Amino acid sequence: GLGGADPKVYSDGQGCHVDVAGRTSPLCEYGDTSANRTMVLFGDSHAASWFPLFDQFSREKGWRLLSRTKSSCFVEDLRFPLYGTDLEYAECFDWKNWVVNELQENPVDLVIVVTKRKDVEILRDQFSVEEWQSGLVSTLNSFRSVSSDVVLVGATPLLNNHARECITSYPNNLDFCHGQFEDVVPSDYQALEIQSADDAQVKYLPTIDLVCTGVSCPVVVGNNVVYRDRQHLTKDFVLELKNLISISLLNAGINLD
């Protein structure tokens, strides 16, 4: 399909992308499982979108990869309802605590924390910017105590249109489907992420320039569909970013070699 299959972490039969009800993760080891260096990919479905790339990095560069992702589970240390309900998402809080406890028993070399837009409705309506930021810093701090390195991967923009549906409907007018930069990238967007990473003394990997020009955030770049819906990057596009992400990681002070 448009942009390749969804990451195998969704469908490998182990339940590695934990569903709403889950409070723990299965083992879910990838990459070079015998390697003496371990990286952890942590977050919700946005983190799972990056899985194909870090899976490839870990296989090529000799890392063991632990996939720790859970559906609709914001990384910020805040008490919020499950998306679409009024019920507190206790399974998310329990799962996050479980992951940190797991790593306290077996510390790792790198934790990759993937955040999502702070202005998703559920967070924007319930928490101030300061509360959101302190919740993110709290999560980052908890990983600093269990990992040699922590990197915060910045959120990718939320489009106004479902990319694949829009491309199918307007194949000859893709401009209609692109996100306009000023519409989909709030001005304080990266500054808040950078500040949070600085406060927690962790590394930061910006993503806006990977998916947007100064004018728009296109749904197609070259031969690759960028988004599979309004917010998740496609497998093919993520893999296409390999060299750029390698450079960005090095610039952030993380060398996977």
Regions found by a protein language model. Name each.
Residues 1-257:
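Extracellular/periplasmic envelope-modification machinery, especially enzymes
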